[in-house]
Structures are given as C-alpha cells and as structure tokens.
Amino acid sequence: MSTGQSDCLALVPPDESWAAAVWDYRAEFEAVGDVLAGTADLGAAANFTGWLAGLRADARPDTVRPGRVSADTFLAVRRSDRRLVGMVNIRHALNDYLFRFGGHIGYSVRPTERRKGYAKEMLRLALNKCKGLKLDRVLVTCDSKNEASVRTIRANGGALENRVPEEDGFTDRYWIEVGR
C-alpha cells in the first residue's frame, strides 16, 4: 500500500449507514463498465435495502437463498478517512460453480483506488476471517489475464492448481493454505 502500513484497512459488515457509499461504489464501476466482483450481486440490486436483505439472508445457513452458499460480505474501509475502497465476499463452502470458477473469496477494488496494494491487504484480511470459519484451505480464482489478481493471490500464498476454460478465456484456480 502506498502508506506502507498493513493495517490501513478494516473489513466492516455493511449496514444502512453505508448505503450512500455502497451506491457510489457501484456507480464508479458502472461509469467505467467494469465488473463488480465480490459484491454479492450488487450490480443487479434494485436498491440498497434489498441488497442488504439478501446479504443478511445469505449469512445464515437456514436462510441462504436458493442456489447459493452461506457467505459474508464485507466493506473494505480505509481507516484514515473511512472511504470504501473495496468489497470482499467470503463463501463458507463451495457448490459446483464456486468450485470450478468462483472460489471461497471474491473481491474488488474501486477503480480510483487500484494499484495501491489494497487488494493484497483485503485478501489477507479475508484469509484471517476464513480461519474463524475453520477453513484450512481456501480456493481463490481469477481470470488468467488479470495480472493484478494473479499477483495478489500469489502474494498471499496462492498455489496454482489448474486453469479452467470458459467461454471468453480461462479461470485460474489457486489454493491457499490458511491453517487455524
């Protein structure tokens, strides 16, 4: 990170107080035509309240929405100014799709905050959360052409298992030993 500090971010559960910041985050991605990864379908949400209700449902095994797995979504907030710089979605288990393409952790950094080391720190913080979920090994995937994500995953201990073909390219599948 540009500050040289490894503790400049906090992973914060979203609540109503973050509505404007989350919608601004979404708008920044839409303005540049970028994909909102690791946001639990924020791009498809009609409004913040509905998106937040879905997150809360997915956080509990007894209320998770059909076709999904239990997951927690966090806002990556810069401590110095409380700016939302990224989002992380941590899946507690893998279904067939997540095993092949999505992995346990998805994340994104807002376009104006990239190339500052935030993704690396976000993934490190997410891996610490995985310890609390008793996950020993975590699957993290990325588009094989996304060199920044490849570097981020490798910097956090990712070991490439394989490359899976998709319609528009390949997905690289990395395993990270988390330990407990």
What are these regions (language model features)?
Residues 82, 117, 146:
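Conserved G/P- and acidic residue-centered "switch" motifs that form tight phosphate/ATP-binding loops
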Residues 140-150:
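Conserved beta-strand-loop-alpha-helix junction that forms the acyl-donor binding cleft
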Residues 141, 154, 159-173:
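Conserved catalytic-core motifs of GNAT/GCN5-like acyltransferases
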Residues 1-104, 111, 129, 167-180:
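GNAT-family acyltransferases
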Residues 88, 114, 143:
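Mobile, glycine-rich extracellular loop/lid and propeptide segments
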Residues 130-141:
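Conserved GNAT acetyl-CoA-binding A-motif
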Residues 106-109, 115-132, 150-155:
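Conserved acetyl-CoA-binding loop-helix of GNAT-fold acetyltransferases
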